Amino acid sequence: MWVGEEWWRPLPPGVSGDVRRLLAARALRAFVDGMISILLPIHLHRQGFSPLEIGGLLTATLVGSALCTLGVGWFSHLGSRRRWLAGACVAMAATGVGFALAADYRVLLVVAFLGTMNPSSGDVSLFLPLEHTALAQAAAPQRRTAVFARYSLAGTLAGAVGTLAAPWPGWAGLPIGAVFLFYGACAVGAWALYRPLSAAVETPEVGVRAALGPSRRIVYGLSALFALDSLGSGFFVQSLLALWLYDSFDISLSVTASILFWAGVCSAGSYLVAVPLAGRIGLINTMVFTHLPSSLMVMALPFAPNLGVAVGLLLGRAALSNMDVPTRNSYVMAVVTAPERPAAASMTATAKSLATAVGPLIAGWLMTASAFAWPLLIGGGLKATYDLLLLWRFQRVKPPEEQ
């Protein structure tokens, strides 16, 4: 079976140029997101903003992204996927310029809400449903999980390199504002990759609303569970995790970036392992039995007696927690019909983004009120609950290749 024999290849055999371009664009965006996820909270912290204010700003970015994602899913039938990707690139460029020029907190809130800034180590932007549906359309069913694994691998590995590059402005004697301008410039590079995409990434029924139909109950159920998982993740998005490490163990920006880089490398490697594992035990079992131990490791983090133990738990979590990402994305695209894919991708992504947005604000308040890492304990507990509910509710709902 291919997934068990050739999972190690950089790309599945026979993938199209469209898939390669989408993976490259994801890597480019993830690289600059990785830099921003480290620099944004520390920059705001040095500017005198409290953890609660920083959490509010991160919440604004996630709520804005969620609403944009919902709009993309609702109105995507009005234009081609390439045209929507072009609009997303314009929004990304404007976001970078806005953060580079703004200094007032209220202005930053507006830019965060309307823009594409990503405080998470994963992708929560309006690019996500567009790229997911394009990948599902361009990939053969038997290659779908492997393609999504490479998509996640490209994003996580590039994001890890981005976190490692976060101290670069300080080394070069540049203000952090230069990184925000670089973020905006990367939007031009992303559009250069999206522009040559072929008609194969488009849904044939452009101009027809892709509403949910026979798969409505499945998508609603998955959206609710994904929201619970993302609510837990919101308590320790990478920006807040970086701030917790930076403050709790009194380490430098370079050390913080290095820790999160190696965590990203561990996550990236796990995506490839997820492919043969899913081929053996199924998508849902892979999602649950790798994610649950990682949730327990998060709950153990507040009790880490020193930096070494904390780093060990973080790396162990990273090696397990994201195996559910390519399998989850593949599962959603598999259990709905092709015309429903844009709406399904948008609804699940919106549920995740809105739920994630709640966490940073509460976590910021908790970090202000107490020195104990309550956000990690609560967030890990919510994610463990999600794992058990997902197994109970969807273990019998099989994708076509498992039936």
Feature map (PLM): residue ranges:
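Helix-loop boundary and gating motifs at the non-cytosolic
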Residues: 12-63, 218-226, 230-260
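Hydrophobic core of transmembrane alpha-helices in multi-pass small-molecule transporters
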Residues: 27, 95, 105-126, 309-323
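Transmembrane alpha-helix termini and helix-breaking/packing motifs in multi-pass membrane transporters
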Residues: 41-46, 159-179, 243, 247-248, ...
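Conserved MFS/SLC helix-loop-helix module at the cytosolic interface between two early adjacent transmembrane helices
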Residues: 67-103
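C-terminal membrane-cytosol helix-exit motif in multi-pass small-molecule transporters
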Residues: 162, 166, 184-204, 386-394
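Glycine-rich segments within core transmembrane alpha-helices of 12-TM secondary carriers
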Residues: 146-167, 351-359
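Helix-to-loop junctions at the C-terminal end of transmembrane segments
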Residues: 68-80, 170, 270-283, 367-368
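Structural signature of the two symmetry-related core transmembrane helices
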Residues: 83-98, 285-300, 380
